[in-house]
Amino acid sequence: MKKLRTILFAITCTLVIALTTLLPVTATDDAFDLGKNLYSTNYIFLDADTGQVLSAKKQDEQISIASLTKMMTVLLAIENSSSLNQTVTITNEMIDGLYEEQASVAGYVNGDTATVLDLCYAAAIPSAADAANALAIQIGGSFENFYQMMNDKATQLGMDHTVFKSAHGLDREGQYSTVEDVSKLLRYALQNPTFKEIFSTKEHTTQATTYYPFGIPLVSTIWAYADTYGYDLANLSGGKTGYTLQAGRCIAYWATVNDMNIIAVTAGASTNVEQYSNLSDAQTALTSLASWHKKTILKKNDVVSTIEYKSFMHTANIDVKIDKDITLDLPADVECTYEVDLPKKFSAELYDQNIQATITFTADNKTIYTKTISITLPQEKNIFGRIILHLQNFIKG
């Protein structure tokens, strides 16, 4: 009896981190709405560490994302280059048509040479379309092959509402994404230290080119305009801006506020009121986030539920415990509660039972976070108990 009781109480509960989800909050006038004063029509704000969505609006609407596309281009270049110091020769194919479309360019001309790393900086910092095209042909061998690589990577990352048809993000028919998909891309890409370094750089100078014997000076589209127009983006660590007539002003960035590691993607901001409305939105959101804080809702080994487990000879109460702290980002003075969706009684079976349950966290009368946990209940060990279970199953057919 003592051995069986020991087995029962030794059951462990393991958090299934991959199944973490959050029901996003829509734009209403409440403490969780980070977008109520934004110009952007589409936005998502999430915790980079936990995936908790803090606030979102039209996050799954298919839209143009303009030069945010270049984050995928640079990521693929980093992941698929044998060496970032490899030299690329610029060809007419890489630059044809860009001036006619009034695309942002670094200024490379036919015959110039550049390293893959310099091209990554050029695509990321001043949003150079010529650099993005050069990376596409260098990495993919052709534009079409590279677009396929982009779409394959999007599928891998769960970007289910994204289709790429360019490396630079200029408007193309049938090309679209969502701010939620872009947040998935950025969250993944930030695990790559080279990507993180490039997109957090304010200035970079390339190797010498035909028209720039001392190298092309590259300046970030984020910090250059923030400094010029007085936007306070002190907490912003890095990111990428974008603009086309179809997309409006866009920005994807990461920031640290009150120990919260935030990822934000906003899109569709009009320039009718403010020229750099995407940067204005970043400032507004970061100011709002200053009143948010991390709060530990559950600590490791906290009991979230107790179940009654009945075997042939014994009945035992088993505590379901959390194996790690659960910390959420919350506005000031907002309390969070939780409920566990788990039956209170279980009976032993002929096999181990893997049980999943959902913990739902609620604040300000809305679901803000859900986490799935799993527990394993051992099979019936007693020989007479197993015989009875076999007979019951036989009778049931």
Predicted feature residues:
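Short, Lys/Arg-rich N-terminal segment immediately upstream of the first membrane anchor
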Residues: 1-4, 56
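Residues at the start of alpha-helices and the adjacent loop-to-helix junctions
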Residues: 2, 16-19, 65, 69, ...
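Sec-dependent N-terminal signal peptides of Gram-positive bacterial secreted proteins and lipoproteins
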Residues: 3-27
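Structural motif marking the loop-to-transmembrane transition
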Residues: 3-4, 65, 112, 116, ...
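Domain-terminus/edge residues, biased toward the C-terminal soluble/receptor-binding domains
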Residues: 159-160, 174-176, 180-181, 186-397
